Amino acid sequence: MKDLLNLFNQQRQTLDFDAIKIALASPDLIRSWSYGEVKKPETINYRTFKPERDGLFCAAIFGPIKDYECLCGKYKRMKHRGVVCEKCGTEVTLAKVRRERMGHIDLASPVAHIWFLKSLPSRIGLMLDMTLRDIERVLYFEAYVVTEPGLTPLERRQLLTEEQYLTARQEYNDDFDAAMGAEAVYELLRTIDLQSEMTRLREEIASTGSETKLKRLTKRIKLIEAFLESGNRPEWMVMTVLPVLPPDLRPLVPLDGGRFATSDLNDLYRRVINRNNRLRRLLELNAPDIIVRNEKRMLQESVDALLDNGRRGRAITGTNKRPLKSLADMIKGKQGRFRQNLLGKRVDYSGRSVITVGPYLKLHQCGLPKKMALELFKPFVFAKLQRRGLATTIKAAKKLVEREEAEVWDILEEVIREHPVLLNRAPTLHRLGIQAFEPVLIEGKAIQLHPLVCTAFNADFDGDQMAVHVPLSLEAQLEARALMMSTNNILSPANGEPIIVPSQDVVLGLYYMSRALENKKGEGMVFANTSEVKRAYDNRVVELHAKVKVRITQVDVDTVDGKRTSGTSIVDTTVGRALLSEILPEGLPFQLANTEMTKKNISRLINSSYRLLGLKDTVVFADKLMYTGYAYATRAGVSIGIDDMLIPDEKKGILTEAEAEVLEIQEQYQSGLVTAGERYNKVVDIWSRTSERIAKAMMDTIGTEKVENAKGETIDQKSMNSLYIMADSGARGSQAQIRQLAGMRGLMARPDGSIIETPIKANFREGLNVQEYFNSTHGARKGLADTALKTANSGYLTRRLVDVAQDVVITEVDCGTTEGLIMTPIVEGGDVVEPLKERVLGRVVAEDVYLPGNDEEPIVTRNTLLDEAWVAKLEDASVQSVKVRSTISCESSFGVCARCYGRDLARGHQVNIGEAVGVIAAQSIGEPGTQLTMRTFHIGGAASRAAAVDNITVKTTGSVKFNNLKSVAHASGALVAVSRSGELSVLDGHGRERERYKLPYGATITAKDGDAVKAGQAVANWDPHNHPIVSEVAGFIRFIDFVDGVTVIEKTDELTGLASREITDPKRRGAQAKELRPIVRIVDAKGNDLTIPNTDLPAQYLLPPRSIVNLQDGAAVGVGDVVAKIPQEASKTRDITGGLPRVADLFEARKPKDPAILAERSGIISFGKDTKGKQRLIIKDTDGSEHEELIPKYRQIIVFEGEHVTKGETVVDGEPSPQDILRLLGVEPLAAYLVKEIQDVYRLQGVKINDKHIEVITRQMLRKVEITDQGNSKFLNGEQVERQRVIEENARLVTRNELPAKYDPVLLGITKASLATESFISAASFQETTRVLTEAAVRGTRDNLRGLKENVIVGRLIPAGTGLAYHAGRRKASGLTDSEMETLSGKPAVVEPVATVADAGADEE
C-alpha cells in the first residue's frame, strides 16, 4: 500500500524553480533528452492503428499508447510497472509520458539553424564577420569558403567560386582547406578562439576612428561576450542532431472514413527524415558530388521549414496550398502558445447568458438563473446531498440533480448563500470589467444585473451577454469578497471619482422630483418635519414642485473622532427635495441635496458621502437613490413628442442676415479683394457663428417659459419641456443634439475632416432636402468606419501599455528620495482648466510647503499624504506650487514605493504594498481609448475654428503680476513685450493665482506690475495676424541691402495710398543677390550704430522673407515702436493630430515630422552666413563658445538677432520632439510635457485620468540609460542598459574606489521598452517572438520571474496583491535573500483585512 501512495506522490511532484534560463542546446544535450532515434518517416499502421517501430510515433521511443500496457499486449497492469517488453521494446508506464519524451534525428550532414542565420542581425554572420549573403552562398552550395589557409596567400573565410577553387587547388595542392555547405560553416565556427578574438577586438576598438566600424565592432564584442558568459559554443548554432517533439504534442487523430487529421509538424518531420535517410544512402554509395550537394541543400531547406517555415524562400505548403505551421509558428502570434494557451486559458465552472436589468437588487447582488446556478455549483450540491444522507454516492446525487427534485433546490439555496460569483463582460478594458456579486436565484434564463454597475461594465440591455465564474477555494472566495465585491469598487481607479453613479432614468427621476416651480399648489406652507411633508403630498395638499419651508434635522459627523452632533433648522426647499432628504444618510449635509439633482450633482453627493461617511453608508445610500429615482421617473411620465422640439421664431431672421453676409463676401471675392482661402474661411466662420446664435435662441425658447408667480407677476422660469429636462439633467442627449433637432444642423465635415461650406439650414423637425441629406451622410459614413477601426487601435494601445508597465508593483513603503515634480495649476487660454488642488490631491509632499513669503513654520511637512482637508488648507494659504513625490523620481530598485505613488485612487487611502499600479495605469489610459477620436484635424475644421485672440481681458478682479517678462516702455506709456516666454497672472486678494495668460512678443501691455484690475478690463492687446519686430532703442532707421526689385518690392496700398516694402523670397532673387541680407539698423543722429541695452550687440534686425516694412529710410523710431511685421499666415497651417493617434505617438516617443528646434545651450542669438537651402543660427554662450544650427529656409525662426535664449527654449516653431526635451531639459520637464500633452487629448473628450497613471508609463519608458563613459565598469560606451543595473554596478565600483560609469537617460517608446525588458519570457509573449528568443538563447539569458506576465506563463501566483506574500515566503524558504525581498519580508505584505478597507478614510501609515 505504501508503494502505491509513493507512486501517486511521484506523479504529482513538480520541479520547484526560481528562474528559467534559455540557451543553445549542444548535440550531447539533445541526445541526453532523447529516448531513441527516429529512423523512419512512418507514423502509424493504418490498418491496426498501432505506431510503426522507429517511426515518428514509435512506442519504444516515446512510451506506451495505453496506461501500463505494452504495445504487443504481453505486459498489462500496474504490477509490471517499469518493465521493458522484450518483444516490442515498450516500457510499461503511463501513456502521458508521450507528452514529455523526446526523440532525435542524427543528421547525415550538419544544418545551420535558421533562427541564428536569418533572424536579423544574423548571429552566425556577426560571429564569423561575414555578410549574410556570403554565408548563404556557402550554405546553399554556390561557393567555397576557405576554412584553413595554411601557408597559402588565401585568407581565412575568403569565398571562392568553383573556378577559383579549382585554380587554387592546382596552384597550392593540399596546402589549404576549403569546403562548402553547413560543414564549412560548422568548421569555421568550431575553430574560433573566443578569448583571443575578444582581445583583438578590444584593441581594434581602441585604435579605430570610423563610426560605422565602431558600431560593427561593438556588436561583435557584445555577441562574443555573450557566448563567453553563457557558456554557449558558436558551433552549436549549426545542428548535427535534431530533437523530435513528443508525439502527443503533434497528434495524429483518425477521423471517420479512414482519413487522418494530423499536425503539420508531422509532415515537416517526415520530409526531414526522408531527405536525411536518402542523403545517408547516397553517402554510403559514394554518389557523385553534385547529387550529394543537392540532397544536402534539400535537407537544409527541410530543416529550415520545420523550424521556421517561410523564413527563407517560399513556404512549404501542404495539400491544400496552405503553408504548413512550423515550430516557430506554434509559439508566436495571437494563436501561438504564449497568447492562446499560457496567457489566456479557458476556465471550468463558468457559464454565460444574456443580461437583463434587476432594478430591485441590492448593489452587492446579481440575479442568477436557477438552471445556470445548479450546473455551476454541481460539485458543492453533490457533496451536500451526500453529507445530508439524501444520496449515498456521487452517482446517486447526480441522478437526483438530473431529475431536479425539490430538495435539490433547497440545497442549492444553501450552497449559494454568501458564496460570491464573478461576473465579467467582454471586452474587459479595466479591472472593473470583472466584479463579484452574491447570487440570488431567479426563474428564467437571463442574468440580472444591478443598474448602477452598468457604467463600470459599460453594459446595456440590448442583448449584451455576460460570463459567470465561480471562485472555488476559500482563498478565492475571500479575495472575491474583500477586493472584488461591487460594493468595494465605488470609486474609479482611473480618477478617484465615483463610478457607481446613477444614469439615465434614475437621474431623470431625481431631477424631476428636485425641480422647483413657481405658483404650485401649497406654495409657502411651513412643515414641522419631512414626514408631515410626505403626508401632505400623499393627500394631494401640496404638489411635488411647490416651494415650501421645512424644519430639517441634520447630523454633523466629526471627520476626526466620528462624534455626532445633531441640530435642526428651517430650510427653504421644495416638497420633492424634502422627500429626498429622508434617504440621505446621517451626517450628509442637506444643502448638498437642496438643489436640482443633475447627474453632476448626484455624483458630487455620492463622492461627499464616501469621503465623509465611508463605504457602508454610501452603498446603502446609492441603492436608495436608485429606488427613489426609478419611482419618481415613473411618476414623472416624461416622454418626448415632436411638439417638444420648439423652433425659435428668430431663426428666419438670423438666416437671412447670414445669407446677406455670405453674398457680400462672394462679391468681394469676385472683385478680387479676398483670396479663395480667405473667402472659404470667412464663410465657414459666418455659418458657425450663425449656428451658435440659432442654438442659443433655441435653448432660450425650449429652456424657459413665462409663468405667473404667487403675486400675479409674469416671470421667466426654467421650463418643464421634456426634451430640455433630459438634456439639462444629464439623463440623455446634449445641447448639440437638441440643436440638430430644433435649431439648425449646421456645418458638416467631409470624410477627410474638412468642412463643407454650405451648411444644413434645416433641422430634423423641419426635415432635410435631398442635397442636405446627402451632405450629412457624407461625413457621417466616415464616422461609422472610424468607430470600427478605433476599437482595434485602442485595444492594441492598451495591450502595449499593459505590457510595458506590467511589472510595476508597489514593493516598499518609502524609497527615501527627496526628488519630485513641481505641480502648478494648468492654465489654457487664461482659464485654469485644472486647479492646483485637483493636481496634488492624493499625492505625497516631497519637501515642506511654506506660506508664500513666510519661511518659518511649514503648513505641510514632507511626506504628508494630501487628502481633501490638507488640500483645502493649501488653497486657503493660496499656495501656488507644491513639490510632490512622483513615480518618475522613485528610487526603488524594483517596482515603486507607496509614498512616491500616493493615494490608491479606488480606495481613498495610501496605496497598499503589492498593488499592481502598472497594470492599473495601463488600463486607466487604455480604457477611455475608444472614446477618443481617430481623426486628424485640418486647420479650417470647425473643431479648430476659434476666432483669433488679439487681447487679454481679465475675468476676475485682482492685481496683475508679470512672470519672466522682458519689456520696454513705449512713448505712449504702455509697455511692449520683447520676450517670448512672458506671462501675466491675475492674483486675487489672498495672493492666489486666478488666471494666467501668455504674452506674445510685441504685445502692448496697458497695465503695470502690481496694478489693480477689474473683471472685464483689457490689459494687453496685439495684432494676431502679424508678428511685429520691435525696436529696443530710440534712433533713426537705416536700411542695409535694400535693393528695389531684388531684395524688396515696393507696394502702395490702394485704399490708404501708403507705401510699404515687402522682403522677397531669397530663392527668387537670382545669383547676384546671393550675398544680400536685408537688415534694418538703428543709428543715432550722427549715423553711429546703436547697441541693444546691456549687450554689445548692434541694434539691428534681420528681416525674414515676406516681412513688411512701413517706415522710410532715415525715419525716427522710439523705444517699443514696430520696425517691421511678418504676416502670420503660413506658419499656422500645421495639421493637428488629435485623439488616439496623438496619444499613441506620444507613448511611442515618435519624432514629429518637422520638429521644433530647441536652443542647445543658453546664450545670445546671432545669424551667420547662409548656405544654399539653410540659414545659420549661432548661439554664443557666456564663456564665448559658439554653437551652430543649420535651419532649412522654409522653417519659421521665432527668435531675433541679439535675443537671449535659455537652453531648451524653442528657436524654430514646431512640435517639440520628446527626445530633445529629455536631452536638453532633463527628466522632469519631459514628464511634465508628456503628461500635459496626453491630458490635453483626453480633456478635449471630457475624460478624466489622474496624472500619476501617465507618470507610471513614463517611468517605464525611461528604464534604459545609454553609457557615455564606461569607467571601470563592464559596460561598453554607447550600450543601452537598464538604469538599475548601472546604479548597482556603480555602487559596487565606488566601494572599490574605481571609476563609475557615466550615463544619459534614454527615452524608449512603449513597444521598444516592452521588448527591451529584462524578462525574455515577457518580451517573447509580446511581439517579435523569434527575435527575442534568438537573442535570449545566444546570451544564455536567465529570467528571474519577477514580473506579473512571466509568473502567469509559468503558472504561479503573480507577485502582486495577495500573491506578494506567497512570493516573499518562497524566496525566504529557498534561502534567497534578495534585497527587495528583505524589504518585503520586513513589512507585512498581506492584503488588508476587510474591516480596514471599509473604514479607510484616514491616512494609514
Swiss-Prot record:
UniProt entry tagged with the keyword Chloroplast: no
Gene3D superfamilies per the UniProt record, alphabetical: 1.10.132.30, 1.10.150.390, 1.10.1790.20, 1.10.40.90, 2.40.40.20, 2.40.50.100, RNA polymerase II, clamp domain, RNA polymerase Rpb1, domain 3
Record keywords, A-Z: DNA-directed RNA polymerase, Magnesium, Metal-binding, Nucleotidyltransferase, Transcription, Transferase, Zinc
SUPFAM superfamilies: beta and beta-prime subunits of DNA dependent RNA-polymerase
InterPro entries (alphabetical): DNA-dir_RpoC_beta_prime (IPR045867), DNA-dir_RpoC_beta_prime_bact (IPR012754), RNA_pol_asu (IPR000722), RNA_pol_N (IPR006592), RNA_pol_Rpb1_1 (IPR007080), RNA_pol_Rpb1_3 (IPR007066), RNA_pol_Rpb1_3_sf (IPR042102), RNA_pol_Rpb1_4 (IPR007083)
Top enzyme class: transferase
Cofactors, names only: Mg(2+); Zn(2+)
Binding of Mg(2+), residues: 460, 462, 464
Binding site for Zn(2+) 2: 815, 890, 897, 900
Catalytic activity: RNA(n) + a ribonucleoside 5'-triphosphate = RNA(n+1) + diphosphate
GO cellular component, one term: DNA-directed RNA polymerase complex
Cofactor note: Binds 1 Mg(2+) ion per subunit. Binds 2 Zn(2+) ions per subunit.
Alphabetical list of Pfam families matching this protein: RNA_pol_Rpb1_1 (PF04997), RNA_pol_Rpb1_2 (PF00623), RNA_pol_Rpb1_3 (PF04983), RNA_pol_Rpb1_4 (PF05000), RNA_pol_Rpb1_5 (PF04998)
Record EC number: 2.7.7.6
Role according to the record: DNA-dependent RNA polymerase catalyzes the transcription of DNA into RNA using the four ribonucleoside triphosphates as substrates.
Protein name (database record): DNA-directed RNA polymerase subunit beta'
Organism, as annotated: Xanthomonas campestris pv. campestris (strain ATCC 33913 / DSM 3586 / NCPPB 528 / LMG 568 / P 25)
Phylogenetic placement of the source organism: Bacteria, Pseudomonadati, Pseudomonadota, Gammaproteobacteria, Lysobacterales
